[in-house]
Amino acid sequence: KKNTVNENLKRLGGLDIECEKIIPSPQENGYRNKAQYPAAIIDGKMRFGFYSRHSHRVAPCEKCPLQPDFYADIVITVEKFCDDNGITAYDEETGKGLLRHLYIRDGRKSGEVLVCLVATGEIPNVGRLIKMLTGQSENIKSIVLNINKKDTNVILSSECRTLWGKDTISDILCGLEFEISPRSF
């Protein structure tokens, strides 16, 4: 890793400096604070996961060791809602379908959670989903709909609408408080 960092500092940053050492995180699992899960219908059911290597085929993954355990609970809840309400997954090849991605963020210090649904239009019976999610965890502070109608593999569009709760979640990093939206890096 040290060599990779040094090479990238030189090649990409134009900096001729040496990284002294890489300090590993003591937390090997559950350290990610953001996940973007593409949607797909697999065996007749809504599933979220990650793209298989070098493809846009979704490999279902309810629980990823890099994400906190509660992300899996949110994934399962949204899958159940979609199956119970006939919500279709967007298909990049045909341009048809409603739900494109499930996007989850959390603030590590604040404990606040943002759930963002990326869809091509309005989600039917979304009030039911809001009740399911907010009944599941009091840490969910924001549920947002991002409408992305474009024929693109870019996940988010500029059109975000808060369905429930706050527009952003907050977190503290290095003593500074940040407001985090779905479109934050």
Predicted features and spans:
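Accessory RNA-recognition modules of RNA-modification enzymes
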Residues: 1-185
